[in-house]
Amino acid sequence: MTIQFLDAVPLTTLSGVGAAISDKLGRIGIHNLQDLLFHLPIRYEDRTRITPIHDLRPDAYATIEGLVQTCEVQFGKRPILNVSLSDGTSKIMLRFFNFNAGMKNSLQPGARVKAFGEVKRGRFMAEIHHPEYQIIRDNAPLILEETLTPIYSTTEGIKQNSLRKLTDQALAVLENIQIAEILPNEFNPHPFSLKEAIRFLHRPPPDVSLEALEKGTHPAQQRLIFEELLAHNLAMQKVRIGTQQFSAYPLSYQTDLKQRFLAQLPFTPTDAQVRVTQEIEQDLTHPFPMMRLVQGDVGSGKTLVAALAALLAIDNGKQVALMAPTEILAEQHATNFRRWFESLGIEVGWLAGKVKGKARQTELEKIRTGQVQMVVGTHALFQDEVEFSDLALVIVDEQHRFGVHQRLMLREKGKQADHYPHQLIMTATPIPRTLAMTVYADLDTSIIDELPPGRTPITTVAISEERRAEVIARVNHACVNEKRQAYWVCTLIDESEVLEAQAAEAIAEDLRKILPHLRIGLVHGRMKPAEKQDIMQAFKQAEIDLLVATTVIEVGVDVPNASLMIIENAERLGLSQLHQLRGRVGRGTTASFCVLMYKPPLGKISQKRLQVLRDTQDGFVISEKDLEIRGPGEVLGTKQTGVAEFKVANLMRDRKMIPTVQYYARRLIVEQPEVATKLIQRWINQREIYTHV
């Protein structure tokens, strides 16, 4: 039997898999036979040979065999079962911190035992804590594994052994079917077929290089990694090509509003802003929708670039919509654009969840009739009740975490008659080039790689929680003596907004007791949008000295007089998020400071993370380091959105393969488009989105 897509085979065809096991496997992304076979081991253990006890090395995993010499219970806070074993070359202690009477009775002196585990140094001899073990009865032969033992990532209720048995069944099914080799030989630079690679990686022979497997460089791994990266790249290219089949309003190059706008600015745009604006203007003249991502570090002036793009659309008699992720940021944009555009005779509308009743109906009517040439808001802009008059450009701020499917949905919502709007996506979270080339291959990318002159560098220091009193004194000095404002950011590792809000309230209360003369405000995710807005407005107008906040202030808030930021539990946040938070200060001409307060002792990864922030303020350098430390899923926020969740590939580890993948993808989509479609269907979950655009 020949099967093109193994995901057509349900898990329930395997023995022992019912609804309960299916649900548990679903938690780790295993929904069908293909998912199970693509759920490759995260590491391997060599249980194919016995190591003499004399030859054991600390921190290595090994299989040993010997006779029990002693079996004793050590009493203390909790009892420990200590079993000494000898094989004639030396002795070792097996230690069990959880044991029962049955284990104690079976491990009596004279019993022959085979055990596997991690070797540790002990006080008197080598030790293995909680080994896997087996009693060898009488003169029964010693049976060893024939292949390396795979270790899988798993979930509660699914043990390693259970997953191995299920994989054995899946491999047996694989033996009896023919999988279509979709990839033609001339497009496959690796010697393994798909079937051979899967079989090899689940059960590698003992003579394979463990080092190659750990590094992901074995040809069997490379075969699967290559095909998966190729499928993703093809999917993005299909979206890009598909976009060019749609119609958009080609905007003619107009300079009237642009020149009047630039003439009223108290500064000159940077060379980078000019370059990126030209790239956008070029795109907007095309008769198909622009899909462009503008990356710029915190404070690089992306809003100005967005304004110039908006003016070109408005000069052509069209409407513009700007969508921001939060009401705070959306209202800030509305205020800025009104200030900039009022003298040009352009009306800027505002639409968010809190605009209700008559005011909302009035705003909707203005949008429908075209009286409002630019409308700013949250995702409320794309609700069914909103009807645009002549929408030509959608600007999406800080939504780089959208996956391609969300970008396509947004495009559909903005469609009018047969025309789709141009899309400009802006982010202040620089995306590492490796990720941009893969995850955002459907977008053209512009980078604003220059900060406006006059920005003051931020001094960043890491201070232990034990010096909290000194930090509070520094806040007091900044607010009282220097007449500056400060942020105090609370972070919780628990994602519960309730707990985070409670922590922020407790800290604000403490600070009010210690600094009663300061005006201290509080903002957190549990507050109503209107409350948050009022507090932020008061902070902006210098009616609040110290703002205690959760990470809701990560994005876009602009208060030039704030020059000190304290981040509690800084070790709990990723580099890019810390960099975003730090970017809330240093927006004026005064020297600014960021204090990363941590709870000791710091782990190695946390030390590395805080050191990077002390060393650099370059968001692109920081994003690359973040990718190295945390991996692509975390950097993109894809734990929530499902962007770039690869089954086999690891973008950091496999980044050198990406240029080769791009070369083959470009050829394949032109020379054999039907093969490209089948590859996408095999590897990508949102099949219908990618293959039918």
UniProtKB/Swiss-Prot annotation:
- Which amino acid positions bind ATP, per UniProt? 296-303
Short sequence motif named DEAH box, residue ranges = 397-400
EC numbers: 5.6.2.4
Question: What Gene Ontology terms for biological process does this UniProt record contain?
Answer: DNA recombination; DNA repair
Domain Helicase C-terminal span(s) in chain numbering: 482-628
* Keywords noted in UniProt: ATP-binding, DNA damage, DNA recombination, DNA repair, DNA-binding, Helicase, Hydrolase, Isomerase, Nucleotide-binding
What are the boundaries of the region Wedge domain? 48-146
Which stretches make up the Helicase ATP-binding domain? 283-448
What is the reaction catalyzed? Couples ATP hydrolysis with the unwinding of duplex DNA by translocating in the 3'-5' direction; ATP + H2O = ADP + phosphate + H(+)
Give the range the annotation lists for the signal sequence: none
GO terms for molecular function, please? ATP binding; ATP hydrolysis activity; DNA binding; DNA helicase activity
What PROSITE patterns does the annotation carry?
HELICASE_ATP_BIND_1, HELICASE_CTER
**What family classification does the UniProt entry report for this protein?**
Belongs to the helicase family. RecG subfamily.
Q: What is the role of the protein in this entry?
A: Plays a critical role in recombination and DNA repair. Helps process Holliday junction intermediates to mature products by catalyzing branch migration. Has replication fork regression activity, unwinds stalled or blocked replication forks to make a HJ that can be resolved. Has a DNA unwinding activity characteristic of a DNA helicase with 3'-5' polarity.
| Domain comment in the entry | The wedge domain within the N-terminus inserts into the replication fork junction, where the lagging and leading strand split.
Oligomeric and partner information: Monomer.
Q: What's this protein's name?
A: ATP-dependent DNA helicase RecG
Give the organism the record lists: Pasteurella multocida (strain Pm70)
